[in-house]
Amino acid sequence: MVNDPPVPALLWAQEMGHVMAGRARKLLLQFGVFFCTILLLLWVSVFLYGSFYYSYMPTVSHLSPVHFHYRTDCESSTSLLCSFPVANVTLAKGGRDRVLMYGQPYRVTLELELPESPVNQDLGMFLVTISCYTRGGRIISTSSRSVMLHYRSSLLQMLDTLVFSSLLLFGFAEQKQLLEVELYPEYRENSYVPTTGAIIEIHSKRIQMYGAYLRIHAHFTGLRYLLYNFPMTCAFVGVASNFTFLSVIVLFSYMQWVWGGIWPRQRLSLQVNIRNRKRSRKDIQRKVSAHQPGPQGQEESPQLSPVTEDGESHADPSGTEGQLSEEEKTEQQPLSGEEELEPEASDGSGSWEDAALLTEANLAASGSAPAPETVGSSEPSAGSVRQRPICSSS
C-alpha cells in the first residue's frame, strides 16, 4: 500500500498546479513592470509640463515698495521740502533674476497712500514721473502722469466720520485715500536692451504720504491667457498629451524589441564588377596590331616584341599565332568560389587612356620599321633602305 504508484489524476493536478503557479508569477511580474512603467511615464509627463509652465509663464504680478528720499540741507519752512521726492526701484528678484520677460506686455502702476490732510487737499494736481534705465544707467523709457486726491465735501467728510467713528477710535479704519496711478498701460521688455531699474519722482514739495508701492502686472494673451485663467484644465490636457506621446514611443519600442520591428529592414546587396586591367590592356594591343595595314601587320617591330599577344619574339618562325602563355591561361580560367566577370566592351572602353597610349606607340614604331618580303628572311629586299634607330639625348 505504501509503495503504490500515484494516481494519474494526482500527477495531472500537480503538473497543472506547477503550470498555473508559473503563469501566475509571470503575470504578476508583467503587471509589476507595467505598473512601474505607467508610473514612470506619468511622472515624466508631469515633470515635462511643469518645466514648460515654469519656463513659458512669466511672473504674474510683482509688488515692490517705493522709498522716497529728498534733500534736507536747505533752509525752508516746515511745510516745504528741499527737493522733489525721488526713489530708485530695482526690477530684479534678489538682485539676479529679472522680473520682466521679453515680449510680454505689462501694466505698470504706482500706488500712493495719502492722508486726507488739509495740506494734501489744498495740494491740487501734481505730476508723477517714471524713468526706466538699463545697464550703465542709460535711460530707455520715460512716462509722466498727473494725479490728485478725490474731492469730498465737508458735509460728506462729517457724515463719514460719524458713521465710522467707532472704527476710527479703535484703529480699524483711517482717513486716507489710496491712489493708483497708471504709468504704463502696456510696457514691453526689449531683449537687446533689458530694463534693470526705474527712477520715480513726484513733482511736489508739499506732498504728504504714508507709503508708495510699484506694481507690475502681466497682461496675458493667447496661450498664456489660457494657462493663467484655466490652470487645471490646461494642466490636465498637457499631462495627458505628454503621457499619450510617451506611451506611443514606449509601445513602438516594445514592438520593435519583441517582434523585430513593424517594418523589417531590407537587405541591400551590392555587386561589384572587377575588371582585369592587365587583360584589357592586352586585348587592346591585339586589336591595334590587327588593324595595322599592309605587310606591317604581318610582323611587329622588335620594340613591341615583349608586349605582343602570344608573348614570344617574331624572330622565331616556329611561333604559332593564337598560342597563349601559361600566365594568360591562368588569368582566363575563372577562380574557384567567385562569379565570372562580365564581358568587357568590344571597343575597349574600360581603359581608354591605355588604348590611346599604346595606339600612338604602335603606330610610331610600325611606321619607322622596315617592311621585309618574307617573315623568315633576314636580308632586306632590294630597293629598301636600312634604317638604324637613333636615340636622342633628350
Curated annotation (Swiss-Prot):
Residues 292-303 have a biased composition (Low complexity). The modification Phosphoserine is found at residues 289, 346, 351. Residues 281-394 are annotated as: Disordered. Keywords: Endoplasmic reticulum, Glycoprotein, Lipid degradation, Lipid droplet, Lipid metabolism, Membrane, Phosphoprotein, Transmembrane, Transmembrane helix. It comes from the Eukaryota. Undecamer (an oligomer having eleven subunits). Oligomerization is important for its function in lipid droplet formation. Interacts with LDAF1 to form an oligomeric complex. Interacts with RAB18. Interacts with ZFYVE1 in a RAB18-dependent manner. This is Seipin. It comes from Bos taurus (Bovine). The gene is BSCL2.
